[in-house]
């Protein structure tokens, strides 16, 4: 698949052979910013794209130029990331619609608060729709902060974190969450994990074996206030070499036990697990 939702092609004049011979390509995610108004050459644009499918399915007898370079009635699929709240459920998905519906929000970026935080106290379930697997968020800053009634996270495998740099307070104060699968997280670009699981008082186990923390500089209070947490599974990719603030990383993790048992020295210098 190709994720082209940020492509603005209003000044492009030549798209000849743009996707030609991409025989394994099944999906092209785009938005209404992908236009062909000024394109004078689009010969072979979709030549031999044998598996490509949008609203239209590629076949030998169809035009391979810019004719189908669109979402409606074309080979493109809508791919604008959205978050919607309804009846206690927060759903992450991709859409072709550029207008926001009721209780529907854009993804936040950097250290900007997510707009859906206004619903945090009513959220009991989070769903990552299969379409969201093609989204590439850059920040998870306070995504589920104060979702103290959240009990279930569904489809988390559809959250691709390879471009994420900020996971501050991502699950902070998710007090009713007893299990959470973050084993598939790609954290190679993350620099800040402070308070990521802070005050998850019901969480019993965490598998962070896939976490690569080589670029993380802040782990302050990362697991702090998790009294039910007994086990953290990790690998040698979980390093603290760049961490400048690891204070209270394991504060009040009174039942945590690994290579060494929890004691009151709770910073990163006592973080063997």
What is each stretch, according to the model?
Residues 1-13, 23-39, 50-66, 122-135, ...:
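Structural signature of tandem-repeat unit edges
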Residues 5-8, 18, 45, 143, ...:
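C-terminal per-repeat helix/turn "cap" of leucine-rich repeat
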Residues 15, 42, 140, 167, ...:
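Hydrophobic face of beta-strands forming the core of extended beta-sheets/solenoids
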Residues 20, 57-158, 165-172, 194-198, ...:
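Surface-exposed repetitive/solenoidal architectures
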Residues 43-45, 54, 112-118, 222, ...:
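Small/polar residue-rich beta-strand/coil "junction" motifs that cap repeat-based extracellular fibers
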Residues 44-49, 66, 248-251:
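Long, ordered, amphipathic alpha-helical scaffolds
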């Amino acid at each position: 698949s190709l994720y082209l939702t940020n492509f603005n092609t209003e000044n492009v004049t030549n798209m000849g052979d743009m996707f030609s011979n991409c025989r394994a390509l099944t999906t092209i995610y785009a938005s209404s910013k992908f236009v062909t108004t000024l394109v004078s050459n689009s010969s072979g644009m979709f030549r031999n794209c044998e598996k490509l499918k949008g609203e239209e399915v590629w076949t030998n007898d169809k035009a391979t130029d810019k004719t189908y370079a669109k979402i409606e009635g074309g080979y493109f699929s809508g791919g604008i990331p959205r978050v919607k709240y309804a009846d206690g459920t927060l759903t992450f998905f991709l859409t072709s619609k550029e207008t926001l519906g009721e209780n529907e929000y854009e993804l936040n970026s950097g250290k900007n608060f997510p707009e859906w935080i206004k619903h945090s106290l009513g959220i009991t379930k989070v769903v990552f729709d299969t379409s969201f697997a093609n989204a590439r968020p850059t920040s998870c800053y306070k995504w589920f902060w104060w979702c103290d009634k959240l009990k279930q996270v569904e489809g988390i495998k559809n959250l691709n974190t390879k471009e994420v740099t900020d996971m501050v307070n991502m699950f902070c104060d998710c007090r009713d969450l007893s299990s959470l699968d973050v084993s598939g997280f790609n954290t190679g670009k993350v620099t800040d994990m402070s308070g990521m699981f802070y005050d998850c008082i019901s969480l019993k186990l965490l598998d962070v074996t896939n976490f690569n923390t080589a670029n993380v500089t802040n782990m302050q209070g990362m697991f702090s206030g998790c009294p039910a947490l007994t086990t953290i599974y990790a690998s040698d990719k979980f390093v603290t070499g760049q961490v400048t603030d690891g204070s209270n990383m394991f504060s009040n993790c009174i039942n945590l036990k690994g290579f060494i048992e929890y004691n009151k020295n709770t910073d990163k210098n006592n973080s063997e697990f």
